[in-house]
C-alpha cells in the first residue's frame, strides 16, 4: 500500500513540476479590429518569468547622421554583441509601443540550440526595440526586423513576435539558420 502511495505522490510531484516549468513563458493576448467592441486592436504582453518587472524603457525620437553606429547588447544578459548602423530617423518609444501606436511583444518558443547564429549581432530584445524605433506600421516593422537579421544575423532561439498597429496585428515566428549564417527563417 505504501508503494502505491509513493508512486502516486511521485507522479503528482512530477505533474506539478511539469506544469510549473511550462508556466515560465511569456503570454500575449491578441484581439483584432473585428473582434473588439470598438474596432480597436488590442495586445497585452506579460513576461511570466521572475526577472522582468515591466520597466518602461524610453528611446527618444531623433535624427541621426549617416554612418552613426550604435552598440547592441543582448537583451537578457547585457552581453555586447557588436555595432550596427543607426537609422537616419528614429521614433519615440516607451515600453513596447512607439508614438504611432505600433506595439511589439514576444513569446519565446526556444527551438534547436544549433540554429542560433552565435556570430549574429541582433537578439530578439534588440530586434523589438529597433523595430519600434524604425517603423510606423506593423508591416513596416516586419520588413525592418527581417532586413536587420538578414544583414546582421539573428542571435536568439525561436521567438514568436506579436506586431500590431491601430489597423492590424501580425504574428511572426523567427528562428536562426545556425552559426555564421545570416538571416532567419520566418
PLM segments and residue spans:
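Bacterial N-terminal signal peptides that target proteins for export
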Residues: 1-11
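Intrinsically disordered and other compositionally biased segments
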Residues: 9-14, 160
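Generic anion/oxyanion-binding catalytic loop in active/binding sites
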Residues: 14-15, 130
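Sec/Tat signal peptide C-region and signal peptidase I cleavage site
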Residues: 17-25
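A contiguous strand-loop segment
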Residues: 26-124, 144-186
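Second-shell loop/turn segments in exported
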Residues: 116-117, 126-135
Amino acid at each position: 500500500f505504501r508503494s502505491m502511495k509513493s508512486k502516486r505522490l511521485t507522479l503528482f510531484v512530477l505533474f506539478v513540476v511539469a506544469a510549473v516549468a511550462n508556466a515560465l513563458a511569456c503570454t500575449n493576448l491578441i484581439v483584432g479590429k473585428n473582434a473588439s467592441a470598438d474596432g480597436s486592436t488590442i495586445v497585452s504582453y506579460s513576461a511570466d518569468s521572475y526577472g522582468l518587472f515591466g520597466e518602461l524603457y524610453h528611446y527618444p525620437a531623433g535624427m541621426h547622421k549617416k554612418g552613426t553606429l550604435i552598440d547592441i547588447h543582448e537583451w537578457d544578459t547585457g552581453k555586447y554583441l557588436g555595432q550596427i548602423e543607426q537609422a537616419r530617423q528614429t521614433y519615440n518609444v516607451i515600453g513596447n509601443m512607439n508614438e504611432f501606436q505600433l506595439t511589439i511583444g514576444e513569446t519565446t518558443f526556444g527551438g534547436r540550440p544549433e540554429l542560433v547564429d552565435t556570430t549574429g549581432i541582433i537578439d530578439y530584445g534588440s530586434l523589438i526595440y529597433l523595430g519600434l524605433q524604425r517603423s510606423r506600421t506593423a508591416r513596416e516593422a516586419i520588413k525592418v526586423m527581417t532586413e536587420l537579421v538578414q544583414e546582421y544575423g539573428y542571435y536568439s532561439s525561436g521567438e514568436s513576435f506579436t506586431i500590431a498597429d491601430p489597423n492590424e496585428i501580425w504574428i511572426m515566428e523567427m528562428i536562426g539558420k545556425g552559426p555564421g549564417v545570416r538571416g532567419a527563417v520566418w
